[in-house]
Amino acid sequence: DGTPTFEYADPRKGEHPDWGTKIFDYSKPEVQNFLIANALFWIEHYHVDGLRVDAVASMLYLDYGKQDGQWVPNQYGGNQNLEAIAFFKHLNSVVLGRNQGAMMIAEESTAWPKVTGAPEDDGLGFSLKWNMGWMHDFTEYMKLDPLFRKGAHYQMTFSMEYAYSENYILVLSHDEVVHLKCSMLNKMPGLGFDKFANLKAAYAFMTGHPGKKLLFMGQEFAQLREWSEERELDWYLLAEEPHQQIQNWYRDLLHLYRHNKALYELDTDPAGFEWINKDDTFRSIFSFVRHSKDNKKNLLFVCNFTPMERPD
């Protein structure tokens, strides 16, 4: 009969005007059951490692993407969706409580506090949060001609100012290689060899930076075209040596990561990271140490983002 079942009845709460989509009424037990059952089915029956929840900010804020008059404040006059907040706490408590080792990952683009905090500490309870700030600063820096990178040096160091505010995952996701944004290789400046050299440096810096890692498929062998769900990856590129070299380089970085605890065991502890020199602006060099918990198996990273050799 057209009566809203899963969404809010009031269109000011039940619709996203920009997307033309409905918003779940998280206060309804049947909606909560439907969503949590779906999450559990994927993890417990299909055995996926975890779930990434898209556009979390759109659920947390009642005024997300809306103008004055298009939204209704909560009972306290604020713009927080209290039902959605309670739902996320419940969802993550149930899923992670029943499935040890599973991951619940939030794609959340604002400064909402404690996204990965424990629900009993008023956190949302996610395992990891996408580090959207790092991703934006990092990709914008890497697009620059090395000659001009000195003017954007701070973009590569700023992420360490907030790196421990959440349990972050560094993401170079599908969102960054679609809609005319270019593949990771074609984001790099220069021609031919220069693009591949820049990509190697980028992946090395990412490996050393605190936070878990996510690299979208195809970028590990330097896919040329943007990703499209309508075709497979361009696997034929692996017949060419530069693409083989990138794949081997990324394999080696993963091996380095897996076999060196300094790269992950203190990811959420400031004691695990130390700048050696973050202010070498003129030469566009970043140097830092990743510390292991016992401080005996530390790793030094020196990343040079110019094509100039720096023997010292």
Where are these regions (language model features)?
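Substrate-binding/active-site clefts of carbohydrate-active enzymes
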Residues: 1-79
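Conserved alpha/beta catalytic core and glycan-binding cleft of carbohydrate-active enzymes
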Residues: 13, 47-49, 64-229, 258-268, ...
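Residue-level preference for long, well-ordered alpha-helices that form the structural scaffold
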Residues: 28-31, 35, 76, 80-84, ...
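Alpha-helical packing segments of well-folded alpha/beta enzyme cores
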Residues: 31-42, 87, 91, 202, ...
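Aromatic-rich peripheral "rim/lid" segments of glycoside hydrolase catalytic domains that contact
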Residues: 228-240, 250
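Catalytic cores of secreted or luminal carbohydrate-active enzymes
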Residues: 241-267
